[in-house]
UniProtKB/Swiss-Prot annotation:
Residues 172-297 form the BAH domain. It comes from the Eukaryota. Its main location: nucleus. Belongs to the class I-like SAM-binding methyltransferase superfamily. C5-methyltransferase family. Involved in CpXpG DNA methylation. Plays a critical role in the maintenance of CpXpG DNA methylation and suppression of a wide spectrum of transposable element (TE) activities. Required for proper plant development in reproductive stage. The gene is CMT3. This is DNA (cytosine-5)-methyltransferase CMT3. Signal peptide: none annotated. It is found in: Nucleus. Residues 437-500 form the Chromo domain. InterPro entries: BAH_dom (IPR001025), BAH_sf (IPR043151), C5-Methyltransferase (IPR050390), C5_DNA_meth_AS (IPR018117), C5_MeTfrase (IPR001525), Chromo-like_dom_sf (IPR016197), Chromo/chromo_shadow_dom (IPR000953), Chromo_domain (IPR023780). Residues 64-89 have a biased composition (Acidic residues). Disruption phenotype: Reduced overall plant height, early flowering and reduced fertility.
Amino acid sequence: MAPSSPSSAAAPTRTSTRKRAASASASAKATDEPSTKRTRRPKAETKPRKKKDEVKEEEKPPMEDDACGEEPDAEEMALGEEAEAEEAEAEQKQLDAPAPGVARKRVAQPSRVRHGSDGDHDPEFVGDPFPAKEARDKWPQRYQRNAATRRPDEEEDIKARCHYSSAKVDGTLYCLHDDVYVKAEEDKADYIGRITEFFEGTDHCHYFTCRWFFRAEDTVISSIMMENADDEKHDLKRVFLSEEKNDNVLDCIISKVKIVYIDPNMESEAKARRLADCDLYYDMSYTVAYSTFANIPLENGASGSDTASDISSDDVDSSKGKVVSDSEASSVGKATLLDLYSGCGGMSTGLCLGAALAGLNLETRWAVDFNSFACESLKYNHPRTEVRNEKADEFLALLKGWHSLCDEYVKKDIDFSSAGASENEEDDDEPLEKDEFVVEKLAGICYGGSGREDGLYFKVQWKGYGREEDTWEPIENLRDCPLKIKEFVQEGYRRKILPLPGDVDVICGGPPCQGISGFNRFRNRKEPLKDEKNKQMVTFMDIVAYLKPKYVLMENVVDILKFADGYLGRYALSRLVAMKYQARLGMMVAGCYGLPQFRMRVFLWGALPTMVLPKYPLPTHNVVVRGGAPNAFSQSIVAYDETQKPTLKNALLLGDAISDLPEVNNHQPNEVMEYGSSPKTEFQRYIRLSRKEMLDSSFEGKDGPDLGKLLDHQPLKLNKDDHERVQQIPVKKGANFRDLKGVRVGANNIVEWDPDVPRVYLSSGKPLVPDYAMSFIKGRSLKPFGRLWWDETVPTVVTRAEPHNQIILHPNQARVLTVRENARLQGFPDYYKMFGPIKEKYIQVGNAVAVPVARALGYSLGLAYQRESEGSSPLFVLPDSFTEVGRQAAPARASSVGIPVGEVVEQ
């Protein structure tokens, strides 16, 4: 594996093919300086000696002790207590608040006199009414009695006596399908709508119906994003057509407005001509449910000249109504994926497995994460992936630098097979002087990192020296050997070691937003993006803006929709929409897709206008409900409507997932072991499938190593005191520290010391029941040293395995859940091996996206990518075969439903 830090100044550094080193005095710097200085070497063939305190490039940082700390971190316990109390308070507020109905436009009281008019003009219909039969056929709901099954959040339809095709207001003639401004409440911008009806009500009042257009600030994006956005700006002339309608009295019409439809794929010159001749334009629709911005179906947009575009009919797939380029048509069935903030690869693994079931060969070509152990895990399980261990912002800078290098060194007609064969910078047989060194080849590229200054660096292999002597050198020091740079860039371009704009079909990732965590006492509620801990959301979107993938899938915690009125969630949507991506936001619960944990997460789809926007897969399993969603986004929970009665599989419980795993002790040093028994449940049979059976092509259709072995079945080793405590926790459902001697439960379910029982002590002299357990959540908590049970689920798999303030003890063993048991709760296949210290493995598993959720989303992506996803509904039903063990669901197709309310490169 490549080094995580540059070589020290004490080690000789070579910077070109035949370049003289600087004087000895120039190298007399501290050993922590980046390796941009040169030292004099006595003889070219002499191997340099390392100082004793010097870290070799290939050495890894020392393994952290894989044991639980002697005492829990006091500040961490306090922060956990604050976060839990805040979460409970927020959930209570949610329960107390009324659930919002469908957003409806309202208008102010109509004004009889208009400024600038010649006098009072009573609004009036023009011409004869529609024939009665035609009116009833066009608008049947206006002539029917109100249905008894009307939903509580639906407005009652105003009944009509007759309908008209035109009306006159303030002397201006308005016709059906005209676009108009409609009077809004005081201090609000006038509403924008398209007239769909003129009718006289049974109350003899004159009405019109509008189908509303939304400005960006009227949508979930909100005016806050419009005012504070420092990135892509929203075009103020751009509006979004919705399906929402309202009835209003005729006098609320203010004036006409010219709105044209712009095909998202229209050529720029044609678009400019149309925009010059309009007041506003629209290219997408907006739906409140799932905060959806989407292409407008041809039958649902504008008509006549309004829909005209300058796209050749030869480019349109008439059966689908979508633009298909030659490159897209040839690439159907295969797609490339970039996994940002990849962790150990749970999200990309699930996406690829699901896409394969839909018939799409989705391959994770690139992955980026700052955790070196997570990168090692991902690389092992996806050996063909170019895995980069670096910060995302440095990765973006590298992409831009790589693009420039490709422009400089790669020609379209290049013959890669003979690249560099005919060029020689100099005669390698010429004898070296004592301070000269030869660049044998360039082996890697990075941008900054590890204390280095910003800029491009190459990993240099020196002629006559082993790989342990490789160094990272700035590009400025290698300008004397352009052939080596050219060879590296041309080969890297051919192998696509880094993506260029247009190379990536799908970007997925979960940018960390630690600034909104309850474990952060200094959260910026007014301007969350000013907090450095939330800046990765910006970086993620910047990478999307640069690479322009066909699809984007961002995952994050539900707090991005709760904290600061959902600022970060709104920001992510705003960026995608401003970049002209279709977008859709939903919240999915891991337990709904066959896991024994709740774990609600936000998933945001983005799709170029040329592509089909993916839907959300509806649940396949019942789930034990825990917590809820923010009210403002309650229409974004992926679930069946309460009026629907689907047939779902039973909720998965802890025993379904882990009851087949062998018993292990508090300390289990073996990373590989035998199962010892056969699977007992459908889930266990599925999770034990091989790579080949799961359609995992990471090993090119082979099963890979360790086939049939049980991996990572290791618990975090409890310290002696905690192990003694755990051994005394009863083996029963609901057991925890409250069952230990000396504790009793008093009023209001608050624990207290039992005055009749002397305090019990451990062999170390410390108390059996620690004070922190008694005081946690003011004595109300059931979590310290809590034992899970077979018929329960967990709220969410976490990154820590300490039992001090969470329920994580095995049902009938004196230990915490193992890494593999946690991995099963996240849906990782048993063949998926983790690397690093045990504590790091827990972190990797806990931070991952639940694999079954990603798999279901991957299936949706596969259908959309191949244009096999039909209808405008945001939801679809997975085929029955999707959840059946050993069944390949590729031939099956889902059905839509209606809307409910390379090398690990380290730096």
